[in-house]
Amino acid sequence: MTKSLLQLIILIFFFNYSLFSQSERKFKIHTVAFYNVENLFDTINDPNKQDEKSPMMDITYNRGGVYKQKIKNMARVIADIGEDVTKKNPAIVGLSEVENKQVIIDLIKDSSLSGTDYEIIHYESPDKRGIDVAMIYNKESFKPISTKSYELLIYDDQTNKRIYTRDQLLVSGTLEDDLIHVIVNHWPSRSGGEARSISKRESAARLNKKIIDSLHSLDKNARIITMGDFNDNPMNNSIKGILGAKKNKEDVKIKEMYNPMEKILTNEGIGSNSYRDVWFLFDQVIISKGLLGNDFSSYKFYKAGVFNKPYLTQKEGRYKGQPFRSFSYSKFTNGYSDHYPSFIYLIKEMK
């Protein structure tokens, strides 16, 4: 073999090795999700709350058994979100429609979730229905630094009386050394009609924007996730106008927000909840510019989705084709929730 031929073979080997090495970049991946768990109430009548109006209180037979099954069903869903990709439970999950901390304790103790070392962040809110937002996190992946609950002060347009609703929960912490801020929301409902209730959600949006702006004032590249049941679509003024959430990543500037859920609704026709056979995407995960880009030395946004596996969809009856709700006509259906969860993946290159 000639010297020049040997050099050529060596060159080809190292060239191919280089290409193979680049194509084999490896990434860490985590799921961050939000789930409206539809009236996750305990079986005890709390005199300080209007929980007697909850579907759980309408159950007159085997209420304890219904509660245990409801917990098991919710835990199954949470465990499944993103599992086909990450092969593990979500790192962070925002929750809405939980009555108190105890129901969340019962939730994370279920066998579907007990293998993950989840901790809870929860504040009691002044909501008249007695429902709160909360967050669970895998403490092996996420380490909270600070938490705060922001009270939303809104008033009825006609009576000027205060409307007691859910707080907005801010959790700041590190996802494997990367500082991340998570806001969990459940904005005022469309009770009384969209037009009459719109001002309440726009007030919620202004509070949310204030929180986001305060984080951006400390760091223009802050990694922020605001997620929840906003009771508005991505195109509504509360999200599009007040929060300024953009549909396209390339349009997002410093200190602005990107809403990956908008394309899911408008381009793919996928929603998270349905009313009178019309799909809405009220359950959204919205992120800041700081989580965008191709520098994966820190955690960045990879993909978003609505978790709508077939078992979560009603197969028959009045609500056929809609999310398989837990309660209907004061009875437990052995379903899950009237909302699908929404989620994102965050990825970081392994060194």
Predicted ranges, named:
Residues D42, Q102-I105, R129-D132, S191-E194, ...:
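Extracytoplasmic/secreted cell-surface and envelope-processing proteins
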Residues M1-F27:
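Bacterial Sec-dependent N-terminal signal peptides
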Residues M56-Y67, N89-L95, H122-Y123, D157-T159, ...:
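Second-shell loop/turn segments in exported
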Residues T31-F34, A91-S96, E119-H122, A134-Y137, ...:
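Structural recognition of the beta-strand scaffold that forms the well-ordered cores
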Residues Q22, S214-I224, D232-K351:
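Metal-dependent phosphoester-hydrolase catalytic domains
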Residues V98-L179, N185-W187:
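Structured beta-strand-rich core segments of catalytic domains in phosphoester-bond hydrolases
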Residues H122, L169, G173-I264:
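Extracytoplasmic, non-cytosolic globular domains
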Residues L19-L113, D117, I121-V133, K309-G321, ...:
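N-terminal, active-site-proximal structural segment of metallo-dependent hydrolase catalytic domains
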